[in-house]
Amino acid sequence: VESTGFDLLVMGRTEGPGCYCHANDLLRGFLEKLAGGYSHVVMDNEAGMEHLSRRTTRDVDVLLMVANATVTAVRSAGRIHEIAQKLKLSPGSSHLILNRLNGPADLPGAGTAFAAELEKLEAAGLSLLGEVPYDEQVVMCGMEAKGVDELPEDAPALRAIAEMMEKLNL
């Protein structure tokens, strides 16, 4: 899909068992060929670690992991960060984004298992970049089959993301 301001390449996946080798080779090839024509390339991968071990993600400047504010989700993000390091993907920086928070009260305070997990991640080089608040407008876009590009500029989720992109100088 080509549009004003961005182009979109979607990689489908087959359902059920089977080898993804050919699909991953195609994806790698497209990315290597097309990436040079863009100032920024954003890869939105399915949750999980498979795309890293399949090495479809190379030459990463910034690795962002989005997780809900639970110990389990944050540990998974930490594991992904660890695998990226073991596979020598060498992202310039790695950051965690907490998603769908209802407010500051959703972030457990010091002394909780969640806070301890965040401290471990920070020590391992995975810093907390920011939080995306729960945003009813995002939910409504999904229910009305609209894209997030149709959100109003003052949508809380968009404002939070814009602040994080500023922190990253993007």
Where do the model's predicted regions map?
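Residue-level preference for the first positions of well-ordered beta-strands
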Residues: L8, H40-V42, G147-V148
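Conserved catalytic-core segment of NTP-binding enzymes
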Residues: H22-E131, M140
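A generic structural signal for short coil/turn motifs at secondary-structure boundaries
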Residues: P17-Y20, A105-D106, L151
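Gly/Ser/Thr-rich helix-start
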Residues: R13, M49, K146
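C-terminal boundary of histidine-terminating zinc-finger modules
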Residues: G142-L158
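P-loop/Walker-type NTP enzyme "switch/lid" segment
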Residues: V1-E32, M143
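C-terminal alpha-helix
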Residues: A160-L170
